[in-house]
Amino acid sequence: MSKNKSSSSKTSKTSKSSKKDVFDFTALNSDQLQNVDHNDPKLLEHLKLGPLSMFEDIDNDQERYNKMKQAFFESLFKCVALEQYRDKLFKEMTTINPEDANEDAKVKNSLKLEKEEGSDEKSKKSKKSSKKDDSDDESDNSNDSEESEAEDSDQESEKKNSKSSSKKVPKKSKDNSDVEGSDSEEESPKSAKNAKASKPAAKKSSKKQDSETEEDSESEKKSSKKVAPKGKAPVKANKKKNDSEDEDSGSDNSEEESEEPPKKASSKKPPSKSSKKAQSEDEDEDSGQSESEHSEEESNSDEDSGQSEEESEEEPPKKSKGAKAKPVAKTAKKTPAKKNSKGR
């Protein structure tokens, strides 16, 4: 108990004295720490108050105390050195040199300028592209307008052409021939003249037919029996017509009338000698008349052919009828001759 009291009294005394005289390690550099005197009373008091105060028997065990003191100082130096090095690094990291600061500022400024230039270039490109698009749209619109105008002009020209073509419709002449433009205007008076010339020719042919029918009826009345059909003189006239290729409708009517009598002659008796003489005389008269008629018809046909070629193209089909009827007249002539011979 006495020992404990004495130790407690000592510690109380040392604590009072330590407050006054405390060894400050923070004020020392690493070199100063290395040169500290380990036997310094201040240091010892500090150690006793601090890290070595836990050991109660430190005064009695001197050897142990010395070992602990050495280890403490070694670790202390290491800690101090590390702390000092840490402080230096912190200061170096926090403090920036002006040169480095200027370089950093230059770098930052250059980066900003590059960004601004890039944005300017992008804006210029976008503007150029927008202008190109606008120009393309304008060109497309102009092309579309030109195309529409061209189409409108084409439609107008087509309408004009259609109107002009409708005005110039091919007119059919009296001969059913298509005529257009100025040709129709030039040929129309010719066709009119030809039509006018054909009318008197048709009238003449009708008059000739009437006269021929009257003469035939008179000749039939004179003869007591029906006369055989006329054959020889019309055949010669038909040969002349085929050579000239111009005949009238009058000969057709006369030939058709000549075809009818054979039917009646077949039912009657053969003619007598007096009737044969009268028949021969009538045939001579008829042949003379037919030749004169054919000569007149040829002159008329020449005039008609000089006036218009189109009428001459329409007349041949009528002539073909007369040409077909003539062989029938020949056969009709032969039949009564055979009957007469049999009758004799």
Swiss-Prot record:
- Renumbered to this chain, the Acidic residues biased-composition regions fall at 135-155, 244-259, 281-314
Q: What is this protein called?
A: Uncharacterized protein L201
Q: Which domain of life is it from?
A: Viruses
Renumbered to this chain, region (Disordered) spans 95-344
Q: What ranges does the record list as Basic residues composition bias?
A: 265-276, 331-344
**Ranges annotated as biased composition (Low complexity):** 191-200
Please note every region of biased composition (Basic and acidic residues).
103-123
Look up and give the organism this protein is from: Acanthamoeba polyphaga mimivirus
